[in-house]
């Protein structure tokens, strides 16, 4: 996979990163509202 890292379009990386960040934030807030986020 080291050969394909330089060939991946930046917009794909940005989109995937954005979705992961939004997903993590969503899970964090959902967990905190459910009472599970207090352990974090």
From Swiss-Prot:
Coiled coil: none annotated. The chain crosses the membrane at residues 8-28. It is a single-pass membrane protein. Its main location: plastid. It is found in: Plastid, Chloroplast thylakoid membrane. SUPFAM superfamilies: Photosystem II reaction center protein J, PsbJ. Keywords: Chloroplast, Membrane, Photosynthesis, Photosystem II, Plastid, Reaction center, Thylakoid, Transmembrane, Transmembrane helix. Gene3D superfamilies: 6.10.250.2070. One of its GO terms (biological process) is photosynthesis. One of its GO terms (cellular component) is photosystem II reaction center. InterPro entries: PSII_PsbJ, PSII_PsbJ_sf. PSII is composed of 1 copy each of membrane proteins PsbA, PsbB, PsbC, PsbD, PsbE, PsbF, PsbH, PsbI, PsbJ, PsbK, PsbL, PsbM, PsbT, PsbX, PsbY, PsbZ, Psb30/Ycf12, at least 3 peripheral proteins of the oxygen-evolving complex and a large number of cofactors. It forms dimeric complexes. Belongs to the PsbJ family. One of the components of the core complex of photosystem II (PSII). PSII is a light-driven water:plastoquinone oxidoreductase that uses light energy to abstract electrons from H(2)O, generating O(2) and a proton gradient subsequently used for ATP formation. It consists of a core antenna complex that captures photons, and an electron transfer chain that converts photonic excitation into a charge separation. This is Photosystem II reaction center protein J.
């Amino acid at each position: 996979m080291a050969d394909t890292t330089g060939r991946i379009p930046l917009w794909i990386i940005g989109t995937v990163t954005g979705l992961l960040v939004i997903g993590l934030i969503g899970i964090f807030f959902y967990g905190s509202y459910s009472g599970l986020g207090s352990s974090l």
